[in-house]
């Protein structure tokens, strides 16, 4: 039986909450489309502080894989198709239908552009599925490759080089998009370092925890320092906030390590709630943007007090998503929508 690692339960829940907060801050910016000057710059830097959610999910996904497996079978892939890819498609069908009604456009057009090409918030699942295939291939070659510092360094160079030229070289950018049919955010070269970082940390997990026990404060200082590096590299486009950026790679990576280190100190705090958020995190990720606009129409009245706005919005979103998930959980067939993790919850403990 796999050991339950409480710090990873807390970590997954916190990353889930961070992604919701990122989208809430985006809603505020979109509402004030005429924002400019100091207000726009301030919003830009605040939003980027919490932009590390998606990279952290990629790191965590591969960390869990190399932590829990030393070899895999073909079932490793089929399980992820059933409980990750199929929910992505089914929720994508619902999203595409609702968008076609909202925008009075073709359902087929919405489904192709959003779900198949990855031009929606669920693009992250397309990236993850590519990494599942890559992980399977590496397992079949040699599990110990996940422990390679050389591969880790090369992946960092590859990701940074790709993102730098993709951002700053118009010819390179246009050539890539000419031959790559999906959304640019799904190109794995822009995320490859996070994959190998998660793999390396999962392979050396106990050593990572020992390191964080001694040097967590140093990692926090490094996180602050790397964010100032990002500020120094900012190009003046204060509307575009994305984790698909070479200037944020060090910050995103170190923030994952910092949050993991902080989570090692949590044992029982809000544990029942944290356990539910963690178990339903995949479903929350897919569902919350669908309800976000409608909920924001109410919670934006608290916008002048940002912390109150975020707290109330986060509470309602988590409550609605988990509530819907708990009802669907009563029927085993809905594992193809909410995933399999919610079925591992011990409801009698609540």
From Swiss-Prot:
<feature type="transmembrane region" description="Helical">
    <location>
        <begin position="8"/>
        <end position="28"/>
    </location>
</feature>
<feature type="transmembrane region" description="Helical">
    <location>
        <begin position="216"/>
        <end position="236"/>
    </location>
</feature>
<comment type="function">
    <text>Presumably involved in the export of the biofilm adhesin polysaccharide poly-beta-1,6-N-acetyl-D-glucosamine (PNAG, also referred to as PIA) across the cell membrane.</text>
</comment>
<feature type="transmembrane region" description="Helical">
    <location>
        <begin position="146"/>
        <end position="166"/>
    </location>
</feature>
<feature type="transmembrane region" description="Helical">
    <location>
        <begin position="40"/>
        <end position="60"/>
    </location>
</feature>
<dbReference type="Pfam" id="PF01757">
    <property type="entry name" value="Acyl_transf_3"/>
</dbReference>
<keyword id="KW-0812">Transmembrane</keyword>
<keyword id="KW-0813">Transport</keyword>
<feature type="transmembrane region" description="Helical">
    <location>
        <begin position="119"/>
        <end position="139"/>
    </location>
</feature>
<dbReference type="GO" id="GO:0016413">
    <property type="term" value="F:O-acetyltransferase activity"/>
</dbReference>
<keyword id="KW-1133">Transmembrane helix</keyword>
<comment type="similarity">
    <text>Belongs to the acyltransferase 3 family.</text>
</comment>
<keyword id="KW-1003">Cell membrane</keyword>
<feature type="transmembrane region" description="Helical">
    <location>
        <begin position="83"/>
        <end position="103"/>
    </location>
</feature>
<dbReference type="GO" id="GO:0009246">
    <property type="term" value="P:enterobacterial common antigen biosynthetic process"/>
</dbReference>
<dbReference type="InterPro" id="IPR002656">
    <property type="entry name" value="Acyl_transf_3_dom"/>
</dbReference>
<feature type="transmembrane region" description="Helical">
    <location>
        <begin position="254"/>
        <end position="274"/>
    </location>
</feature>
<dbReference type="GO" id="GO:0005886">
    <property type="term" value="C:plasma membrane"/>
</dbReference>
<protein>
    <recommendedName>
        <fullName>Probable poly-beta-1,6-N-acetyl-D-glucosamine export protein</fullName>
    </recommendedName>
</protein>
<keyword id="KW-0472">Membrane</keyword>
<feature type="transmembrane region" description="Helical">
    <location>
        <begin position="276"/>
        <end position="296"/>
    </location>
</feature>
<feature type="transmembrane region" description="Helical">
    <location>
        <begin position="182"/>
        <end position="202"/>
    </location>
</feature>
<feature type="transmembrane region" description="Helical">
    <location>
        <begin position="308"/>
        <end position="328"/>
    </location>
</feature>
């Amino acid at each position: 039986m796999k050991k339950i690692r409480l710090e990873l339960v807390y970590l997954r829940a916190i990353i889930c909450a961070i992604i919701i907060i990122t989208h809430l801050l985006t809603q505020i910016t979109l509402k004030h489309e005429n924002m400019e000057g100091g207000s726009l710059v301030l919003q830009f830097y605040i939003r980027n502080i919490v932009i590390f959610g998606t990279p952290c999910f990629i790191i965590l996904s591969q960390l869990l894989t190399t932590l829990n497996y030393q070899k895999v079978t073909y079932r490793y892939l089929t399980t992820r198709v059933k409980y990750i890819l199929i929910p992505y498609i089914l929720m994508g069908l619902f999203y595409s239908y609702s968008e076609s009604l909202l925008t009075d456009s073709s359902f087929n057009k919405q489904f192709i552009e959003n779900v198949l090409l990855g031009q929606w918030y669920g693009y992250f699942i397309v990236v993850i599925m590519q990494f599942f295939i890559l992980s399977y291939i590496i397992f079949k070659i040699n599990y110990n490759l996940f422990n390679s510092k050389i591969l880790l360094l090369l992946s960092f160079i590859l990701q940074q080089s790709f993102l730098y030229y993709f951002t700053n070289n118009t010819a390179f950018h246009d050539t890539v998009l000419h031959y790559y049919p999906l959304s640019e955010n799904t190109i794995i070269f822009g995320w490859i370092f996070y994959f190998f970082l998660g793999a390396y940390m999962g392979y050396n997990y106990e050593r990572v925890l020992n390191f964080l026990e001694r040097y967590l404060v140093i990692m926090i200082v490094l996180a602050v320092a790397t964010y100032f590096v990002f500020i120094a590299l900012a190009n003046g486009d204060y509307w575009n906030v994305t984790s698909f950026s070479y200037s944020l790679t060090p910050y995103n990576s170190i923030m994952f390590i910092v949050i993991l280190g902080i989570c090692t100190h949590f044992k029982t705090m809000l544990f029942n709630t944290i356990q539910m958020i963690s178990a339903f995190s995949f479903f929350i990720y897919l569902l919350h943007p669908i309800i976000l606009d409608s909920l924001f129409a109410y919670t934006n009245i608290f916008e002048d007090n940002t912390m109150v706005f975020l707290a109330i919005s986060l509470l309602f979103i988590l409550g609605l998503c988990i509530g819907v998930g708990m009802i669907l959980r009563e029927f085993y067939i809905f594992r193809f929508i909410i995933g399999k993790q919610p079925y591992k919850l011990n409801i009698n403990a609540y």
